[in-house]
Amino acid sequence: MSSRHRGRSLALMCLYQIDLVGTDPDRAMKFDWYDKKITREEKDYAVFLVKGVVENRKAIDTLIKKYSENWELSRISVVNRCILRLSILSLQKEPFLAAPVVINEAVELTKEFETEESAQFINGLLDAFYKKEILPKEPH
């Protein structure tokens, strides 16, 4: 498993705690709840993602609502919301990462923590977001 994947997994678990339980983000980002070894690179990447989502949550949630087609945000599972949030953040803030890689990573996380059906939903939403919000702004 790559350090980016582990960092994303950590970020997902952290965002889940923040969203579901209301854990303070700074407390969650200490990762003292995680019982496996974490490299500095994994932790730094997870913190980057979590901070980015926390700081941009309102705007990201607006985008999720826009592209979720007739789904209220509250109807989307906490795990799926968190995956969408961190993936949209990556698509917006990490232009050096190829969009298909970010979307594939989101799909893999969804398969790991949710269902195949959820993975299709995540893939479709992120693909639509990318094609309408990111791709037109990329230099050609």
Curated annotation (Swiss-Prot):
SUPFAM superfamilies: NusB-like. The gene is nusB. GO terms for molecular function: RNA binding. The keyword DNA-binding does not apply. Involved in transcription antitermination. Required for transcription of ribosomal RNA (rRNA) genes. Binds specifically to the boxA antiterminator sequence of the ribosomal RNA (rrn) operons. PANTHER family: ANTITERMINATION NUSB DOMAIN-CONTAINING PROTEIN, N UTILIZATION SUBSTANCE PROTEIN B-RELATED. NCBIfam families: nusB. InterPro entries: NusB-like_sf, NusB_fam, NusB_RsmB_TIM44. GO terms for cellular component: cytosol. This is Transcription antitermination protein NusB.
